[in-house]
């Protein structure tokens, strides 16, 4: 029973870190990345469709993205969706392809994005601590029901704390890596 609680806590903490990593891929750094456009939805065939399902997105020359549409009639819709996104990018239509040139980030914008990254990291830490609290509560409930001894419960809580410390360290490393990526000119 305690092993299951610890495994569940570890799985949930790992998912929280993965969610942070995914969330940070959408924050623009100096380099072009197709993941930057993951959040963009296009009005296609009567529904909001993710951009990567109606086009292939590739990096060109490090600072620009090339969007090749599967259906050439959707150029205006894709262009409109990019303008509507809060990425601050201006699409350039070249024939049947859309180019997005990423301007270099200003120092002020880098600091702003760095704060945003730090905030996302803090949110992940809070989620991890909540997972720890839930797991410890399950252990205490088992102790109250006399399903485990006090020593087993204390040992399980120590193990859960070690998992929490490791997960928070991982979050710090992910945030630090993203901040370094942002500050690299």
Curated annotation (Swiss-Prot):
InterPro entries: Ribosome_recyc_fac, Ribosome_recyc_fac_dom, RRF_sf. The keyword DNA-binding does not apply. The keyword Protein biosynthesis applies. It comes from the Bacteria. It is found in: Cytoplasm. GO terms for molecular function: ribosomal large subunit binding. One of its GO terms (cellular component) is cytosol. Keywords: Cytoplasm, Protein biosynthesis. Coiled coil: none annotated. GO terms for biological process: cytoplasmic translational termination. Its main location: cytoplasm. NCBIfam families: frr. Responsible for the release of ribosomes from messenger RNA at the termination of protein biosynthesis. May increase the efficiency of translation by recycling ribosomes from one round of translation to another. This is Ribosome-recycling factor. The gene is frr.
């Amino acid at each position: 029973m305690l092993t299951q609680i610890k495994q569940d806590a570890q799985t949930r903490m790992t998912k929280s870190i993965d969610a942070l990593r995914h969330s940070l891929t959408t924050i623009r750094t100096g380099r072009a990345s197709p993941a930057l456009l993951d959040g963009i939805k296009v009005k296609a065939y009567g529904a909001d469709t993710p951009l990567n399902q109606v086009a292939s997105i590739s990096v060109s020359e490090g600072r620009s993205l090339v969007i090749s549409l599967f259906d050439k009639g959707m150029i205006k819709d894709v262009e409109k969706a990019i303008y509507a996104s809060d990425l601050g990018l201006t699409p350039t239509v070249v024939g049947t392809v859309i180019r997005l040139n990423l301007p270099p980030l200003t120092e002020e914008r880098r600091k702003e994005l760095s704060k945003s990254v730090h905030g996302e990291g803090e949110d992940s830490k809070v989620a991890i601590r909540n997972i720890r609290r839930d797991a410890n509560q399950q252990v205490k409930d088992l102790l109250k029901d006399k399903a485990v001894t006090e020593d087993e419960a204390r040992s399980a809580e120590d193990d859960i704390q070690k998992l929490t410390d490791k997960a928070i360290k991982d979050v710090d490393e992910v945030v630090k890596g993203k901040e370094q990526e942002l500050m690299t000119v």
